[in-house]
Amino acid sequence: MFKRHGGELLVLLSHPGGPFWKNRDVGAWTIPKGELEIDEEPAAAARREFEDEMGFSPGKLLSPLGEITQKGGKRVIAFAVEGEFDVASLRSNTFEMEWPPRSGRKKTFPEVDQAQWMTIAQARAKILPSQIELLQRLVDLTS
């Protein structure tokens, strides 16, 4: 999701929840994303994942930003939508994992623990390095 504020392009990024990401900032932020369901169209998956992770449906026509491959080999098909989102209203889905490791105890964590509007320069500094290309594609799309 992106918006313009005072003539400047802002992008909405999310920070992953859970203990692995707790104290990480630079290189940890990401676009809201997730897995395709069987026979699901990429744009439908993008809407569903945005709603799951942010608690809000973007609802508008999505503009394709193309595909990238992340460091671990995960393929990401990205879309952009212009809109408004109050980061204080973030309501992410959750996941469960054993924590601490080998403790036998399960703990529930939000998939996304925070969201933030950032300038493109701020986003370039904080986003997963493999997703920087998506920021440039957004700039190209909106100029």
Residue ranges and their predicted role:
Residues 26, 31, 59, 73-76:
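Short connector loops at helix/strand junctions that flank enzyme active sites
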Residues 6-7, 18-21, 37-38, 72-73, ...:
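Short, charged/polar surface micro-motifs in flexible loops or helix N-caps
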Residues 23, 39, 126:
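Residues that scaffold the ATP/ADP-binding catalytic core of kinase and kinase-like folds
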Residues 116, 120-143:
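Charged phosphate-binding loop/patch that engages nucleotide di/tri-phosphates or the phosphate backbone
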Residues 107-113:
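Non-DNA-binding regulatory cores of transcription-related proteins
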Residues 31-65, 119:
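The catalytic Nudix box helix
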Residues 67-104, 116-118, 138-139:
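Active-site-adjacent beta-strand/loop module that shapes the phosphate/pyrophosphate-binding cleft
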Residues 1-30, 79:
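N-terminal strand-loop-strand
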